[in-house]
């Protein structure tokens, strides 16, 4: 049996989300149909507002509704360290652990020749300009995921940054190979920041 077109379109829309297959998308579509109209309208408005009101910080690349973001504006944070992550969600995960009090920089991905993603596709140039302009930075902590692409990106960044005399370290203990920062618990992230190693 074929679903009516509005349901098919809704299922297709849900399937565009990462990790959502046909079965889950169908379940979400029927759940949405069963919701009352006010809740569906509020949900739709939240989606539109997130897309319209959020953008990337012009300094660090984190997601924000103000520019610069709250972290970059916070002068009480340690201005001597910048922790480099793959995605904005990684900033949220690490900051939630409340053990790191420095600045962040979001790459928006990692080097991946297989996917055709090179240095020019990442937020690397702005990091280098930021380091050149901000002489207070003494350490860059690279917190890319423990994947081959994350490791390659960390090594690439270290080669670019070290000649400037800035210490470059990498998150350590507790993050197993192939793991994503997003899914690590707060204690593991705290230990990873504390136990970082120099590259």
From Swiss-Prot:
Specify whether Iron-sulfur is a keyword of the entry: no
Task: Mark the C4-type zinc finger spans by residue number.
Answer: 57-72
Q: One GO molecular function term?
A: DNA binding
Q: Which CDD domains match?
A: TOPRIM_recR
Keywords on this record? DNA damage, DNA recombination, DNA repair, Metal-binding, Zinc, Zinc-finger
Q: Does the keyword Aminoacyl-tRNA synthetase apply?
A: no
Q: Which residues form a coiled coil?
A: none
Identify the residues that the record assigns to the Toprim domain, covering every copy. Answer: 80-176
- List residues traversing the bilayer: none
One GO biological process from the UniProt record? Answer: DNA recombination
Q: Which family does it belong to?
A: Belongs to the RecR family.
| Function text | May play a role in DNA repair. It seems to be involved in an RecBC-independent recombinational process of DNA repair. It may act with RecF and RecO.
HAMAP family attached here? RecR
State what protein this is by name.
Recombination protein RecR
- Native organism: Lacticaseibacillus paracasei (strain ATCC 334 / BCRC 17002 / CCUG 31169 / CIP 107868 / KCTC 3260 / NRRL B-441) (Lactobacillus paracasei)
């Amino acid at each position: 049996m074929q679903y009516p077109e509005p349901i098919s379109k809704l299922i297709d829309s849900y399937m565009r989300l990462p990790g959502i297959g046909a079965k889950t998308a169908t379940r979400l579509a029927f759940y949405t149909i069963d919701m009352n109209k006010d809740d569906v309208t509020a949900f739709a408005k939240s989606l539109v507002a997130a897309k319209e009101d959020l953008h990337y910080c012009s300094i660090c690349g984190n997601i924000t509704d103000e520019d610069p973001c709250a972290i970059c504006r916070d002068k009480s944070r340690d201005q001597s360290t910048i922790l480099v992550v793959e995605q904005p969600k990684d900033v949220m995960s690490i900051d939630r652990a409340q053990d790191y009090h420095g600045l962040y920089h979001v790459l928006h991905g990692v080097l991946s020749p297989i996917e055709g993603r090179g240095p020019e596709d990442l937020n690397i140039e702005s990091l280098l300009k930021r380091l050149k302009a901000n002489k207070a930075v003494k350490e860059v902590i690279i917190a890319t995921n423990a994947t081959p692409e994350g490791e390659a990106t960390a090594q690439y960044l270290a080669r670019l940054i070290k000649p400037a005399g800035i210490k470059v370290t990498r998150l350590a203990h507790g993050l197993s190979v192939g793991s994503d920062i997003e899914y690590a618990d707060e204690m593991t992230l705290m230990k990873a920041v504390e136990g970082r190693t120099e590259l």
